[in-house]
Regions:
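Extended, folded cores of ATP/NTP-driven motor/assembly subunits in large transport
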Residues: 1-323
Length: 323
């Protein structure tokens, strides 16, 4: 997407919009982007053995070049992307076939965009949670379903860290690691497509999560129409004031003109282009081995947010809920 032409980018955005519009108000979903430090054993290894010829010096130079490029590429950061969805149901028996249909539709929509995806089974989900609760990549995940009856432990025992500490208002601890949960306050009229990319390119352990709830279409249209009516009344009041003061009644406050235009465009998108209205909570959880490194990472993410007219706010006394 980043290197595509403008026409191709528009086509990709259109396809991605169709993916998002698939989710109606009964299907809340979230997009999770996890940057995790890999264990040393998982790092790339370059080994080109020497041979009995005159090119060993070239092989050695090539190996060093590859190692240098690997070191610069991601510094051991592994990047994962997840989409999680749910639906209301009376029980597992009712939910299972419906979830299966939604899963097939979502994977089909992603495939049309050229995105390969696969469903996670129970062990995969435990591995994801284990990685979140053991940042730094030092603790390997060891689990097998057959071990549960033998050990008497539950699944939570296999993924729980040594400790949680949420006593501080703006930070928390997971084992020996420091963490901070923040949310993104979106003040920009249009959110740049580069914001998320720049955050995820950082050399830091973090999790970006977008919790998304679709607003019912009829309710969304009714709400926007109500806002347009309110803006119309405000316009009338401003025009009355202008007439009484002897000013031109066509001169209105700039904010009022902007709000009126934005509301009309939003209503047109909902009614004519089959778009949907979403409620979004954008959270960022940073993790680091030291308090100072954590504050530096949060400051860097905050700088990226400010660059795109947004603000990163710390969740005061809500660190546990944010995590």
């Amino acid at each position: 997407y980043a290197v595509a032409s403008t026409e191709d980018q528009t086509a990709i955005i259109s396809g991605w919009s169709a993916c998002l519009n698939y989710f109606d108000s009964s299907l809340p979903f979230q997009l999770s982007f996890v940057n995790r430090r890999s264990r040393n054993a998982n790092r790339y290894k370059v080994n080109i053995p020497a041979q009995e010829d005159d090119f060993n010096s070239i092989r050695g130079e090539y190996v060093e070049m590859l190692k240098d490029q690997i070191a610069k590429s991601n510094n051991g950061i592994e990047r994962y992307k997840y989409i999680t969805f749910g639906l209301p149901a009376e029980g597992v028996a009712e939910a299972r076939p419906r979830l299966g249909r939604v899963e097939a539709d979502v994977m089909g929509n992603l495939k049309r965009l050229g995105v390969q995806s696969r469903p996670l089974d129970g062990r995969d989900r435990l591995a994801v949670l284990h990685g979140q609760m053991h940042p730094g990549g030092r603790e390997p995940f060891r689990f097998a379903w057959k071990d549960i009856p033998k050990t008497g432990m539950g699944t939570k025992d296999y993924i729980a860290p040594d400790s949680f500490d949420f006593r501080q208002s703006r930070t928390f601890r997971v084992g020996q690691m420091w963490g901070a949960a923040s949310y993104l306050q979106i003040m920009a009229s249009e959110l740049s497509d580069k914001l998320l990319a720049e955050i995820l390119e950082l050399d830091a352990e973090l999790t970006v999560t977008m919790h998304i709830q679709t607003v019912d279409q009829l309710k969304a249209i009714k709400t926007i129409k109500g806002k347009i009516s309110d803006i119309g009344r405000m316009k009338a009041e401003e025009q009355k004031k202008a007439v009484r003061a002897g000013y031109d009644m066509e001169i209105l406050p700039p904010d009022l003109i902007t709000f009126s235009k934005d509301a009309a465009e939003l209503l047109s998108d909902l009614q004519s282009r089959n778009e949907r209205l979403f409620l979004l909570t954008f959270t960022v959880v940073n993790l680091a081995p030291t308090r100072q490194r954590l504050e530096n990472d949060v400051f860097t993410v905050s700088g990226i947010a400010q660059k795109y007219n947004c603000a990163l706010r710390r969740l005061d006394w809500q660190q546990e809920q944010g995590f």
